[in-house]
Amino acid sequence: MSPFAPLASGILLLLWLTAPSRACTCVPPHPQTAFCSSDLVIRAKFVGAPEFNQTASYKRYEIKMTKMFKGFNALGDAPDIRFIYTPAMESVCGYFHRSQNRSQEFLIAGQLWNGHLHITTCSFVAPWNSLSSAQRQGFTEIYAAGCEECTVFPCTSIPCKLQSDTHCLWTDQLLTGSDKGFQSRHLACMPREPGMCTWQSLRPRVA
């Protein structure tokens, strides 16, 4: 597991507990980072309006899961995920689902707490059809192979310096001002040899 995963989880929890007067801010992760740092990664449809708990501290969305990419062991004996939980207010990183299309599938990466799937506005949630073919391949079968040894290392300002040979420098934000650049949409940080990771293309090979 990436050494940054516990830190990321801690930051996420801190954001969750932040007072409502402070806005929630976060840097979108590379999709491989989202996969590796999440307990559950699924494809699902949002099929119900949000339901609020009695104190309105959190809400839940009913979903219909169509595919699981990660989390078989974490889920245990539970046959399915029917709800996603999130803070009720966007100011404390609550996720707000804007699409009204209940047949649209989404890639959802979240944390499993007390047997429930939790997400925030900082979580990786994206329409499945908005992902590149390389990203879909990554979530389906490739990203998992890089989780143990490799780390996507964000570079947001110059100078950038890798801290380990197992890091891949992610420069999309720096070069394009977007987290949806070429490295995010087409590359994965994968082991090349023991103790070394490099960017590898996930673009479909032409026969």
From Swiss-Prot:
Record protein name field: Metalloproteinase inhibitor 1
Listed SUPFAM superfamilies: TIMP-like
Region annotation (Involved in metalloproteinase-binding) ranges: 24-27, 90-91
InterPro entries according to UniProt: Netrin_domain, TIMP, TIMP-like_OB-fold, TIMP_C, TIMP_CS
Domain NTR, chain residue ranges per copy: 24-147
Gene3D superfamilies reported for this sequence: 2.40.50.120, Tissue inhibitor of metalloproteinase-1. Chain B, domain 1 (3.90.370.10)
Localization per Swiss-Prot or TrEMBL: Secreted
Gene: TIMP1
